[in-house]
Regions:
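Conserved short-loop catalytic and cofactor-binding motifs
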Residues: 1, 18, 34, 107, ...
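Single conserved hydrophobic/aromatic residue that forms the stacking wall/gate
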Residues: 1-12
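Short cysteine/histidine-rich metal-coordination sites, predominantly Zn2+-binding motifs
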Residues: 46, 60-65, 87-96
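Generic structural signal for beta-strand residues in well-ordered domains
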Residues: 6, 39, 44, 52, ...
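Residue-level signal for short amphipathic helical patches enriched in basic/charged
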Residues: 8, 37, 126
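Hydrophobic alpha-helical bundles that form the membrane domains of multi-pass transporters
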Residues: 11-59, 66-78
């Protein structure tokens, strides 16, 4: 007792950080709430537990678990988690006189109160050479996916899930591998919209504009976006 108090004169208990794994058992067991759990918003909202602290208490995002849903970005009150913007690269391309086409997600109608023509006009005023709705690509996806579903059902497959949501695809691949075989092989609306643009002008650069973080991650997987 004397030796312990000499080493730690201000407390009778000491937690060894070398041994603690932050399991929370002490917090749950203490009847006097002397051990306080400080919630971490980004950790708490992550549906796949992809965010955690390392041994130094620094938060890290595990890419092998992340499904790019964006909940952590919305939850962080300090703006510590943010997207890597490509706005500067786009503006540089426009400034160089390159043909840059804006592919706009249908969700834009719910993001702004102004008439859609005014929004498209603003994009062209910025320097985009053309604006195309991703809904055009969605029509292609719908048709191809419908045919694929018919084929899968004829083969005896019980059901088929969409290929349009990149967040769901990541969820299936990383956390529900048994569901991966049911994902449609049809490309997403973004992909087919980019194909439409490239068919008209192979040299055109395509820029996806939409609120979905996972779809912006998806754009990095396709060379034509």
């Amino acid at each position: 007792s004397t030796r312990y108090m000499t080493l730690f004169p201000y407390t009778t208990l000491f937690r060894s950080h070398d041994k603690c794994i932050s399991c929370g058992k002490c917090h749950q067991s203490c009847p006097y709430h002397a051990i306080v759990y400080i919630p971490v918003p980004c950790e708490d909202v992550c549906p796949v537990k992809a965010i955690s602290k390392d041994e130094y208490g620094v938060e890290h995002i595990d890419e092998s678990k992340c499904i790019y849903c964006g909940k952590c970005i919305n939850a962080c009150p300090f703006g510590a988690i943010f997207e890597i913007s490509q706005v500067f690269d786009i503006l540089q391309s426009i400034k160089r006189g390159e043909k840059v086409v804006a592919m706009v997600a249908p969700a834009i109608l719910g993001q702004f109160s102004e008439p859609i023509d005014q929004i498209y006009g603003a994009l062209k005023a910025i320097g985009f050479s053309d604006v195309i709705e991703v809904a055009q690509g969605a029509m292609v996806t719908t048709e191809k996916e419908a045919h694929e579903l018919e084929e899968k059902l004829e083969e005896g497959q019980a059901f088929m899930t969409t290929s349009c949501c990149p967040s769901y695809i990541q969820l299936a691949k990383k956390h529900m591998p048994e569901m991966e075989k049911y994902i449609s092989t049809t490309k997403s609306p973004m992909y087919y919209t980019a194909e439409i643009v490239k068919a008209k002008d192979p040299e055109a650069k395509t820029v996806f504009i939409g609120p979905c973080i996972a779809k912006r991650k998806e754009a990095r997987y396709h060379d034509n976006v």
